[in-house]
């Protein structure tokens, strides 16, 4: 039960529901921001977490899928989860690289290699689901629906 809870929490860690205004197209035509752009913004928030914890938390939370927010919310609970192990190993990461491994109409998966702040290397799989943007329903958004637990390895991003 505890493992299931942590897996669900880790899934939500990667998730966020709304897209920041700088990315949303507020015009009348529907648009979708590419998932790799959203992933880059999310990972930048992890990378710079200590420099701007509230802004980073807001970005990560806002890209969470609504189903994950139901499980890991409210936001204060999510923050506490993010600051605890194993999720805290993602915060203030030094480097990362990612490759798209699965692409369907509604889901995209990325393999992400990370150099953590403690100089450990690990890999996670990040899963996005296409859904309506909560703050701008005319647009679709790639929202984090799952993140696997870190899998450690020897070296290299």
Language model features with spans:
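Short solvent-exposed beta->alpha transition segments
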Residues: 53-105
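Exposed beta-sheet edge and beta->alpha loop/turn motif
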Residues: 101-157
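Short, low-complexity N-terminal intrinsically disordered segments enriched in polar/charged residues
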Residues: 17-56
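N-terminal secretory signal peptides that target proteins for export/translocation
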Residues: 1-2
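Sec-dependent N-terminal signal peptides
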Residues: 5-14
């Amino acid at each position: 039960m505890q493992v299931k809870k942590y897996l669900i929490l880790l899934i939500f860690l990667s998730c966020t529901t709304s897209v920041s205004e700088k990315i949303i197209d507020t015009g009348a035509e529907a648009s979708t921001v590419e998932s790799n752009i959203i992933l880059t913004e999310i990972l930048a928030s992890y990378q710079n977490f200590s420099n701007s914890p509230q802004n980073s938390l807001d970005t990560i939370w806002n890209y969470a899928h609504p189903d994950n927010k139901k499980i890991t919310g409210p936001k204060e609970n999510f923050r506490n989860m993010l600051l605890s192990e194993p999720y805290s190993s993602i915060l203030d990461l030094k480097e990362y690289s990612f490759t798209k491994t699965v692409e369907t109409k509604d889901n995209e998966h990325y393999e992400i290699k990370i150099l953590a702040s403690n100089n450990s290397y690990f890999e996670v799989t990040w899963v996005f689901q296409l859904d309506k943007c909560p703050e701008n329903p005319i647009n679709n958004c790639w929202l984090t629906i799952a993140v696997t637990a870190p899998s450690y390895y020897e070296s290299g991003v």
